[in-house]
């Protein structure tokens, strides 16, 4: 595992990055829009060298005494999945679920690519290239992020259906494919070194859907990120949003050469690639939920509400939501499915059920935390206010007491407000409500993954003292994934320049 300093230096490459409202970012390691998140990724790498973290983030010593990062492991057993899950949970929770795309997530993308090309069986070279790329990530700690490859809205509304795909091949060379186009929203491209562009890009090659790993620093690549989440300049008032902003973005490719060893031929659906990614994503959602519960518990104490039963009922609602998803993750790890090479995929039915539970609970959990502390959540002061001679003593009277200084209580309230009442929280809510297709897509995934239709239906019939027809309902699993946000260009509307 490389160090955080080595990762920081790797970002000082030839990448071309724009942030909306900020313009061209010449060095993402020092610019105010990106520096703080770079620092958090530096911390992620450096934890692997910190003795206090090594029992969580590293494997046990092998025969030679060597330890490897769980973040880059290939899970071969339920025990491996459990250990990887513990490492995800431990490293994501301190970010309040806001660091969703890490180099470890990139390893799971690469595992999905490798499994998908093994399923497709196009050629031995495809498998060799995919395996070599995953090994490269594990050996170097290189940071890969994910894009489904969906086109931008302007492309999808083009009058000619043949021009609506995100990418097109400009030419084919001995070295690889030269591609051009614009890929829609994905997370953390400004901090990654590679972006996987998935099958929604619409590029076909040799009778298969072509997907790509594109280096962010490659000639012709431009990353365009959304505006920075609004936040106060004082970190006391923005303890999370001053540190964590992954900056979703688009990827523009202007005649970019993708080497053959980074071209992976798959099926038209990106689902096979994402088998491990969905599991990691649920850990991020769970970390957000656990942080919400932790804040609620801390506020119960700080606001003197531990004997207030209506408040404790709110807390139990949060506990129920958290424990439901924890149980789904445990089940997914203890009931895995085999990949093509025998690696363990977390049980997809359990991950889908947990994802649906989290999608349904997330808005209410945030609402409960907004309710629980009362109006103090809105009017809590800053550290600078408390240090101001004219009002500091009065604020101490207003917010101190019950075993807390005003500074301590205000810090907790500002943390809670930043978690569920900030621009960063608004972005997370808006994004996750439609992530991976939203609730309808997750229902389809669960319908596909649930394996007991026939067993349950026929089991009921066996309780009757009659000869009953055999029921075959396994065909329910053959459901198409809902089409993601199909658009229809308005008829006859003139194009605008």
Model-derived features with residue positions:
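FAD-binding core of flavoproteins
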Residues: 151-281, 458, 463-495
């Amino acid at each position: 595992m490389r160090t955080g300093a080595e990762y920081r230096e790797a970002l000082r490459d030839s990448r071309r990055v724009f942030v909306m409202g900020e313009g061209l970012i010449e060095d993402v390691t020092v610019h105010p829009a990106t520096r703080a998140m770079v620092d958090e990724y530096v911390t992620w790498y450096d934890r692997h060298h910190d003795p206090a973290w090594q029992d969580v983030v590293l494997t046990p010593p092998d025969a030679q005494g060597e330890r490897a990062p769980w973040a880059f492991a290939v899970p071969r057993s339920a025990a491996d999945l459990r250990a990887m899950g513990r490492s995800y949970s431990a490293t994501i929770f301190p970010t309040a679920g806001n660091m969703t795309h890490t180099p470890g997530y990139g390893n799971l993308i690469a595992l999905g690519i490798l499994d998908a090309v093994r399923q497709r069986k196009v050629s031995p070279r495809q498998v060799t290239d995919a395996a070599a790329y995953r090994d490269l990530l594990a050996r170097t700690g290189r940071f890969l992020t994910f894009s489904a490859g969906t086109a931008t809205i302007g492309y999808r509304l083009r009058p000619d259906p043949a021009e609506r795909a995100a990418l097109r091949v400009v030419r084919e060379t001995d070295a690889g494919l030269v591609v051009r186009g614009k890929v829609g929203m994905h997370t953390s491209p400004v901090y990654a070194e590679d972006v996987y562009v998935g099958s929604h890009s619409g590029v076909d090659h040799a009778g298969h859907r072509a997907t790509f790993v594109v280096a962010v620093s490659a000639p012709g690549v431009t990353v365009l990120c959304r505006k920075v989440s609004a936040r106060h300049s004082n970190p006391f008032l923005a303890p999370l949003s001053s540190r964590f902003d992954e900056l979703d973005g688009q990827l523009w490719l202007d005649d970019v050469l993708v080497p053959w060893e980074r071209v992976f031929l798959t099926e038209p659906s990106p689902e096979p690639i994402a088998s491990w990614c969905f599991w990691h994503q649920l850990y991020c959602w769970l970390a957000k939920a656990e942080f919400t519960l932790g804040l609620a518990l801390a506020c119960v104490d700080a606001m003197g509400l531990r004997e207030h039963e209506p408040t404790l009922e709110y807390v139990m609602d949060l506990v129920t939501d958290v424990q439901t998803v924890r149980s789904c993750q445990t089940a997914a790890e203890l009931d895995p499915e085999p990949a093509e090479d025998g690696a363990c995929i977390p049980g997809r039915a359990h991950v889908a059920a947990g994802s649906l539970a989290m999608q349904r609970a997330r808005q209410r959990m945030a609402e409960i935390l907004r309710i629980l502390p009362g109006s103090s959540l809105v009017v809590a002061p800053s550290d600078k206010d408390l240090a101001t001679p004219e009002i500091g003593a009065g604020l101490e009277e207003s917010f101190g007491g019950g075993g807390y200084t005003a500074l301590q209580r205000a810090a907790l309230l500002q943390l809670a407000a930043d978690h569920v009442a900030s621009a960063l929280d608004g972005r997370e809510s808006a994004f996750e409500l439609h992530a991976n297709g939203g609730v309808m897509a997750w229902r389809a995934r669960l319908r596909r993954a649930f394996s007991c239709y026939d067993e349950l239906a026929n089991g009921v019939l066996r309780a009757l003292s009659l000869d009953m027809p055999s029921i075959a309902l396994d065909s329910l699993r053959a459901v198409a994934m809902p089409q993601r946000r199909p658009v229809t260009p308005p008829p006859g509307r003139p194009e605008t320049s």
